[in-house]
């Protein structure tokens, strides 16, 4: 391995996102808006760029139009400097089928890797919210001598069936002894039986070894063609898999509160909870860390505006994120996230909610513990999140935790 290896980054952005329905009804999961002005894809791309990795391929598949458009508009680099972020849709180069899994997605685009000829491939998912310096992970990968390294983070043992579970070699703490993808039961860590070391879905691989593993997987009969389910266990079985402890990752400008923050936002509850993490007085995830910025399209929007200051008609927002272009006109917003161009009219009330772009809340309408997709309109006196049975009767999604989701372009008229 050379001292300054050539790096190619691959972002796996082809997931269908069925658990986030109806937010993924018309868009790919990585294109789902997050945090007011961002999309989920902005987080892994920002991490890669901030790490100094600017040759990036984004593998897309389902409903990718808005994702492709966002990447082409926001993530533009000068090719003169050899930098690029390129969306690559499913090519069907090896057969008339979609990607069969994350490993198959990489195998089907192996020609792109061959053209670049990197020494190392960095592979990341597109549906997590976090900050990470991948350079630190790559350096450990090189020093350990591993062919394949998995980023790991501690998670509650009761969630083991949602993650790849890493068992570390006690004699070599940077190496993986065993890797199981989403086991129904498992044992906890030696120092904390209530926790597991879970895979974050981020990998670093030596290119030659990765090619060999993908080729074997493509021919295997009993495989799901999955990076976590098949490729990681393959390297672990050969004693060639390393583990990188995410807790050791140091980010400029991070605080004790948001150090090693990582959230899977693959379900409505996880997506909602991650938004609530943003708006605390001391947020669990700090969007305002300019030493490691999260990039997105800035747009030509005017500042947010709050109007009406009467005793019974006060336009205001508390404990909330309010994006550019928002007008709060005599309404009340509390503990919520408002995306650009939202309108809150007089005597309306928004509490514990997430509103996407262009939502309009008319007079005396009320929204509680809800996610409203783009361009939803609530007419005067209408409600969302107040009466669960009424929400279900209108065809809205209501989670077991009481989060109501209203699909894009819906007019709510009680």
UniProtKB/Swiss-Prot annotation:
Its EC number is 2.7.7.27. One of its GO terms (molecular function) is ATP binding. GO terms for biological process: glycogen biosynthetic process. InterPro entries: ADP-Glc_PPase, ADP_Glu_pyroP_CS, GlgC_bac, GlmU/GlgC-like_hexapep, NTP_transferase_dom, Nucleotide-diphossugar_trans, Trimer_LpxA-like_sf. Pathway: Glycan biosynthesis; glycogen biosynthesis. Keywords: ATP-binding, Carbohydrate metabolism, Glycogen biosynthesis, Glycogen metabolism, Nucleotide-binding, Nucleotidyltransferase, Transferase. Signal peptide: none annotated. It comes from the Bacteria. It is an enzyme of class 2 (transferase). Disulfide bonds: none annotated. SUPFAM superfamilies: Nucleotide-diphospho-sugar transferases, Trimeric LpxA-like enzymes. The keyword Nucleotide-binding applies. Alpha-D-glucose 1-phosphate binds at residues 99, 164, 181-182, 199. It catalyses: alpha-D-glucose 1-phosphate + ATP + H(+) = ADP-alpha-D-glucose + diphosphate. Involved in the biosynthesis of ADP-glucose, a building block required for the elongation reactions to produce glycogen. Catalyzes the reaction between ATP and alpha-D-glucose 1-phosphate (G1P) to produce pyrophosphate and ADP-Glc. Belongs to the bacterial/plant glucose-1-phosphate adenylyltransferase family. Homotetramer. This is Glucose-1-phosphate adenylyltransferase. It comes from Bifidobacterium longum (strain NCC 2705). The gene is glgC.
């Amino acid at each position: 391995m050379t001292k300054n290896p050539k790096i190619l980054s691959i972002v796996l952005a082809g997931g269908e996102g069925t658990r986030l329905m109806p937010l993924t009804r018309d868009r790919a999961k990585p294109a789902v808006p997050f945090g007011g002005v961002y999309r989920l894809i902005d987080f892994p791309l920002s991490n890669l760029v901030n790490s100094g990795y600017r040759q990036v391929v984004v593998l897309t598949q389902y409903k990718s139009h808005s994702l492709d458009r966002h990447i082409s508009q926001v993530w533009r680099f000068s090719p003169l400097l050899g930098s690029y972020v390129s969306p690559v849709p499913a090519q069907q180069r090896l057969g008339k089928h979609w990607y069969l899994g994350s490993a198959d997605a990489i195998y089907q685009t192996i020609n792109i890797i061959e053209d670049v000829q990197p020494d190392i491939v960095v592979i990341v998912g597109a549906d997590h919210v976090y900050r990470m310096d991948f350079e630190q992970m790559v350096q450990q990968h090189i020093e350990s001598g591993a062919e394949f390294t998995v980023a790991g983070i501690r998670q509650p043992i009761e969630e083991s069936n949602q993650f790849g579970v890493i068992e570390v070699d006690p004699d070599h703490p940077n190496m993986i002894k065993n890797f199981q993808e989403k086991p129904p039961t498992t044992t906890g860590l030696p120092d904390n039986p209530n926790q597991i070391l879970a895979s974050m879905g981020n990998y670093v691989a030596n290119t030659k070894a990765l090619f060999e593993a993908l080729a074997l997987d493509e021919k295997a009969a009993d495989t799901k063609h999955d990076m976590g389910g098949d490729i990681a266990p393959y390297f672990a079985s050969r004693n060639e898999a390393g583990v990188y402890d995410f807790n050791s990752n140091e980010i400029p400008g991070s605080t004790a509160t948001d150090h090693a923050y990582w959230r899977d936002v693959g379900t409505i509850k996880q997506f909602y909870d991650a938004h609530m993490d943003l708006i605390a007085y001391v947020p669990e995830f700090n969007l305002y860390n300019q030493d490691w910025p999260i990039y997105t399209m800035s747009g030509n929007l005017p500042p947010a505006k709050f109007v009406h200051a009467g005793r019974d008609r006060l336009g205001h927002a508390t404990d909330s994120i309010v994006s550019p272009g928002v007008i709060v006109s005599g309404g009340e917003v509390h503990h919520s996230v408002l995306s650009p161009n939202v309108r809150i009219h007089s005597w309306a009330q928004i509490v514990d909610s997430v509103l996407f772009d262009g939502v309009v809340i008319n007079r005396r309408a009320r929204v509680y513990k809800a996610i409203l997709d783009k361009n939803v309109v609530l007419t005067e006196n209408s409600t969302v999140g107040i009466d669960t049975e009424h929400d279900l009767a209108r065809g809205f999604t209501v989670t077991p935790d009481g989060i109501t989701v209203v699909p894009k372009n819906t007019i709510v008229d009680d």
